Amino acid sequence: MTERVDPKKLIKGGLHDWEVVIGMEIHAQVTSRSKLFSGASTEFGGEPNDHVSLVDAAMPGMLPVINEECVAQAVRTGLGLKAQINLRSVFDRKNYFYPDLPQGYQISQYKDPIVGEGEVLVDLPEGESMTVGIERLHLEQDAGKSLHDQDPTKSFVDLNRSGVALMEIVSRPDLRSSEEARAYVTKLRTILRYLGTCDGDMEKGSLRADVNVSVRRPGEPLGTRCEIKNVNSIRFIGQAIETEARRQIAILEDGGKIDQETRLYDPGKGETRSMRSKEEAHDYRYFPDPDLLPLEFDQAYVDALASGLPELPDAKKARFIKDFGLSAYDAGVLVAERASADYFEAVARGRDGKAAANWVINELFGRLNKEGRSIEDTPVSAEQLGTIVDLIGDGVISGKIAKDLFEIVWSEGGDPRAIVEARGMKQVTDTGAIEAAVDAIIAANPDKVEQAKAKPTLLGWFVGQTMKATGGKANPAAVNALLKDKLGIE
């Protein structure tokens, strides 16, 4: 079957249009207190080689012992990816030499991974979505870290990270643009955070991406791919794909051919650089690790873990749309972070869901973004924001005054109801007072009155003037009704 090509995703070269094909290998650090095969701490930071056991340092005679929590976290992740959980998997030795790999091999999984095929539903701009296939998820050890800036003539090795459990999540080459790739990684990180299986902190290296990029003319077979290693931000993932795709297009249009290789993205120079020729599986001489038995568990173990899973983003989004009447876009924004979704639910409980979403997304998120703060660091609690929504709904304050009240609560804290009482912020509902303000504005603007009778949209100007005259405290509905009556507008 011929694959359908979206013209909007094609990259224009000097001679032809080109399609970019992208597959991702995400390395997600497993959330656990100890490493995959030792009891050493996984805590970030600390002095070099503080969190190292004899197993991590590959001392002779030291044997690996599987960390059951890492196994459980991998199974939870597989379930969250709607993937096949393999009841039997095998750990293999992946043989290669790095100075910061003390064993001379990495314990990974090759032919028999713990998790098989799955999928991720990815939300795209303009309300579109796509399904990205997951090929596999396997457990493996992280390597240590070589330090080259401590001495001009020597390199040092820090093994704190050596042996930390990683989940390598391999996607199918289903992505066709840098935007899709960024959206995929964002969604995958959200799922991992909901599950509590990886914190997704790319700055600390908890989530790293290897990006496989190739280009082809539409309808042609897949081109030769290059792998861009260890991209550590979602923004850089997009830039690396664009840069590498254009490099390959330039070579092909010049009559050259693409060498299969591993490359590194340099965001400072905006280029990818060759690291080494890309290895094939046989180069690593995989074989089952003789120190580890095959990993086996039964379906009851999987079912027990499945029963403890939290509500995941797709299910939560569907529920927000159904229960609170939200648009797909607003629901998607709210479920992007678990803490944001929990905050919204606390505000919306027993209230108008759309009003609650409006205040959380536009006012709260807007202010948090402006100040570079996270939802966990908000000075306005869900209870306080819920009270502000109640005060508007009950007609106690107007929308304009509510924004002033939000600023006070943000800066000073306190009970919104008490602040409204103490500062005289209640909405003016006395029709006599509102009528006096309306009459004064009509009397002062006879020319506008005549224009409004011919052009009813000018009513908004009179409403604005009345609200201004009453300090924003007049009830907007009462103002509208009075003005329509006095101006003779239907």
Curated annotation (Swiss-Prot):
Gene source species: Methylorubrum extorquens (strain PA1) (Methylobacterium extorquens)
InterPro entries: Asn/Gln-tRNA_amidoTrfase_suB/E, Asn/Gln-tRNA_Trfase_suB/E_cat, Asn/Gln_amidotransferase, Asn/Gln_tRNA_amidoTrase-B-like, GatB, GatB_C_1, GatB_Yqey_C_2, Gln-tRNA_amidoTrfase_suB_CS
Function: Allows the formation of correctly charged Asn-tRNA(Asn) or Gln-tRNA(Gln) through the transamidation of misacylated Asp-tRNA(Asn) or Glu-tRNA(Gln) in organisms which lack either or both of asparaginyl-tRNA or glutaminyl-tRNA synthetases. The reaction takes place in the presence of glutamine and ATP through an activated phospho-Asp-tRNA(Asn) or phospho-Glu-tRNA(Gln).
Keywords: ATP-binding, Ligase, Nucleotide-binding, Protein biosynthesis
GO molecular function, one term: glutaminyl-tRNA synthase (glutamine-hydrolyzing) activity
Name of the protein described by the UniProt record: Aspartyl/glutamyl-tRNA(Asn/Gln) amidotransferase subunit B
GO biological processes: glutaminyl-tRNAGln biosynthesis via transamidation; translation
Reactions catalysed according to its record: L-glutamyl-tRNA(Gln) + L-glutamine + ATP + H2O = L-glutaminyl-tRNA(Gln) + L-glutamate + ADP + phosphate + H(+); L-aspartyl-tRNA(Asn) + L-glutamine + ATP + H2O = L-asparaginyl-tRNA(Asn) + L-glutamate + ADP + phosphate + 2 H(+)
Entry similarity comment: Belongs to the GatB/GatE family. GatB subfamily.
EC numbers on record: 6.3.5.-
PROSITE patterns recorded: GATB
